[in-house]
């Protein structure tokens, strides 16, 4: 990465790769470290690693979304004071938007995904109630996911709660009903069956939402490594056909290309977490390391050969 910028989220847009490049002097709430003038970027690369374009973005960017064939959305400031940057990748122009009211969860926005034409965003850094013996990370009663719509004033966006942090869900391994306690909504994904997947990072769980909306159903997969709860960042499912993986290592300022000698098995889930790339058994939540020795892996995508 150029200079001291650190890669985070990755996006395949057309035939190029867009990369969040964070200036570490941008705090996650959008403020700057005292005495610094940080400038984070979104960098566009071709598949040979050449820089094609650079977009300077305000605050601490974290999420990327392909809205359509010529538009990329960027979420910035995952702890507080969230903004959206809408980039026209054909005209190479961009616009910054702010929420039309303070988000209910009092935090920022992290990852985004589009499903059936609706944009969903993770409600990161929520204000939670006091910790208890059974809820050491606090107790959530605020939204964990919003839908995002742009307002006609071209300056603001609107957030509508789509999933509460204390929603009722089915625990996948035990097939029992539980009450969620999502204290750290972070990365998002779409699984092969079309479910919206939300990573509640410090809670070490993936939450699956079937048919998001009024008639949605929710299930939760606690994640473990060698029997211990294990937090992850991005999770992706290997596609059919030939592909390779790109994985960003934030503090190492690296993006790895990972190829499987015999090819990736379609439908297998992979997660980046705690210096390791892991496969995920989506029936039990048990994970298996497949690539180790990284610093802080964050963004993960598959790219078709």
Feature annotation, model-predicted:
Residues 1, 50-56, 93-103, 158-179, ...:
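A short beta-strand motif characteristic of beta-propeller blades
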Residues 1, 143, 157, 243, ...:
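Glycine-centered loop/turn motifs
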Residues 20-38, 122-142, 208, 257, ...:
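Short, conserved, GDST-rich strand-edge loop motifs in beta-rich repeat architectures
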């Amino acid at each position: 990465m150029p200079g001291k910028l650190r890669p985070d989220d990755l996006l395949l847009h057309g035939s190029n790769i867009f990369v969040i490049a964070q200036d570490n002097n941008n705090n996650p709430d959008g403020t700057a470290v005292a005495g610094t003038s940080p400038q984070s970027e979104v960098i566009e690369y071709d598949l040979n690693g050449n820089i094609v374009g650079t977009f300077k973005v305000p605050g601490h960017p974290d999420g990327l979304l392909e809205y359509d064939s010529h538009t990329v959305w960027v979420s910035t400031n995952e702890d507080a004071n969230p903004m959206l940057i809408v980039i026209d990748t054909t005209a190479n122009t961009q616009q910054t938007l702010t929420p039309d009211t303070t988000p209910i969860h009092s935090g920022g926005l992290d990852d985004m995904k589009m499903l059936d034409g609706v944009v969903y965003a993770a409600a990161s850094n929520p204000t939670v109630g006091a910790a208890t013996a059974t809820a050491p990370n606090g107790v959530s009663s605020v939204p964990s996911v919003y839908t995002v719509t742009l307002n006609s004033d071209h300056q603001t966006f609107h957030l509508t709660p789509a999933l509460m942090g204390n929603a009722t869900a089915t625990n996948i391994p035990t097939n029992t009903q539980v009450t969620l306690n999502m204290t750290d909504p972070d990365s998002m994904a779409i699984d092969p069956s079309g479910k919206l997947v939300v990573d509640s990072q410090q809670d070490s769980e993936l939450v699956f939402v079937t048919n998001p909306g009024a008639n949605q159903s929710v299930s939760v997969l606690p994640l473990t490594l060698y029997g211990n709860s294990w937090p992850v960042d991005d999770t992706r499912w290997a596609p059919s056909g030939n592909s390779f993986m790109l994985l960003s290592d934030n503090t190492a300022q690296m993006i790895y290309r990972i190829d499987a000698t015999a090819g990736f098995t379609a439908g297998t889930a992979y997660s980046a977490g705690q210096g390791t790339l892991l496969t995920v058994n989506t029936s039990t939540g048990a994970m298996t390391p497949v690539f180790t020795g990284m610093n802080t892996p964050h963004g993960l995508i598959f790219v078709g050969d």
